[in-house]
Amino acid sequence: MSGTNYRTLAIVGSQWGDEGKGKITDYFAQQADLIVRWAGGDNAGHTIVIKRNKYKLSIVPSGAFNKKSMNVIGMVVVVNLRKLSYGNWVIYKQHGFDLLKNLRISDRVHLIFPYHMKIDELQEEYRQKDSIGTTKKGIGPCYQDKAERIGIRLGDLFDEKGFLQKLENNLKFKNEVLQKFLIVKDLTKINLKRIFWHYFQQIKSLVTDTSILVDNAIHNHQKFYLKEAQGVMLDLDHGTYPFVTSSNPTASSIPVGVGIAPRYINNVLGIVKAYNTRVGTGPFPSEIFGEVETYIREAGHEYGTVSGRARWIGWFDGILMKHSRELVVILVWLIMLLDVLTTIKELKICVGYEYQGQQIDYVPSTIKEYEMCKPILITMPGWDEDISNVTTFEGLPHNAQQYLMKLEEIVGVPISLFSVGPDREQTILMNKEIF
């Protein structure tokens, strides 16, 4: 890479989410002036470990644990105000972090209401065996209201009369829908106004036009870091539809979600695990079964931060990563949880798919085709040495080095960082010119 000192760094989950974006955001936040989350909602969780203390977050950007940086919730994020209330700030206050000073929220974010969560739950029950595995946080129905132009944005609460009118209009229809599904308890305008007004007063001073904040940061040559939730394979358009999220967590959506021109994005990092996981429903060609599956799940603590659900476990999928590389235009990538693979005697890597007797090297666009794909695997020797205290690539066991080099060869993108444990200090940066 050139000697450019990158000012704008975007990180994109390149699998099915849960790749470790929270940890990496916290890591780079130590150098950033601004951290911006541009999409998703509180359906995605992030776990950060600092000096062996574990913190689980959902809506506040992971950079909140850096007192020097400003954290921004961008305009395409959907927000449950209760998750931003004072009661959820205890974790930060206990460690000396004041969100009133280092958090700002776009006045354009759409709000999640109780009726969104109820409808989300009902839709999942109605689908039965065809459930898509939603977290039932109301994310999809909120984005649906946005697309139908009946959504309520955070900035609407500054106009009490206008807010109440929009809420009343929505409740007329939402209550009718809920009653038809035998949920007879009405969601009333008065009750919702009281709840939302209470939460709004707590965060009112944080609400602003964040696109101006970001624009000023760019022109003042500040370093800022862009982060999404979920991953490329959960993208509404490019993922395994319909088993996807309701937003676009690929780098191409950054300009819309943040409010900047594409030319300001200097570098895009793809983040992946040294193996593969997914949660919910949908095709997963490289899935592992048996003892190795159980070992990786327990060693990697592979349970959803928000849902608590056990994640599916799979071998590293090179075809999926090439798909992500092309969609996101990944310049460098980061390998997380390499330590989890320690003591596994044979490691496998998916290098192709078998589909109807033919070998293919791409991700099919339809679920039916993708579900019929079988992995074509190569085998590499594992390692037994503890790598949790390694601080350089050269300090890794020979087989671990060979494994990383093979992944780099398959994907065709240089690895710039790898992780050997959950703590911030267990992050090894191989290319110091990233940021």
Curated annotation (Swiss-Prot):
One of its GO terms (molecular function) is adenylosuccinate synthase activity. It comes from Spiroplasma citri. It is found in: Cytoplasm. This is Adenylosuccinate synthetase. Pathway: Purine metabolism; AMP biosynthesis via de novo pathway; AMP from IMP: step 1/2. GO terms for biological process: 'de novo' AMP biosynthetic process; IMP metabolic process. HAMAP family: Adenylosucc_synth. The lineage of its organism: Bacteria, Bacillati, Mycoplasmatota, Mollicutes, Entomoplasmatales. Keywords: Cytoplasm, GTP-binding, Ligase, Magnesium, Metal-binding, Nucleotide-binding, Purine biosynthesis.
